[in-house]
Curated annotation (Swiss-Prot):
PROSITE patterns from the UniProt entry: SNAKE_TOXIN
Keyword Disulfide bond attached: yes
Chain coiled-coil ranges: none
Cystine connections: C24-C42, C35-C59, C63-C74, C75-C80
Superkingdom as given in the UniProt entry: Eukaryota
UniProt name for this protein: Cytotoxin 2
Amino acid sequence: MKTLLLTLVVVTIVCLDLGYTLKCNKLVPLFYKTCPAGKNLCYKIFMVATPKVPVKRGCIDVCPKNSALVKYVCCNTDRCN
C-alpha cells in the first residue's frame, strides 16, 4: 500500500508543472507556446515601415535592441505579446 501511494505521489509530481512557465503567443494570437526554461520574455517583432503588423512572436531570453528597420516589443506576462 505504501508503494502504491509513493508511486502515485511521484507520478503526480512528474505530471504537474511545479515551476512557473511563461506562455507566449505565436504569430497568430489564437495559438501560443509554453516557453522553455531560461526564456522568460515574450516578444513581438514589427517592421518599422508597417508598425501595426507583427512579423514574428515567441519566447526570448533578452529583448534585442531596435534597429532602423525592426522594432522589438517585449513583455513578461502570459500571452502579453
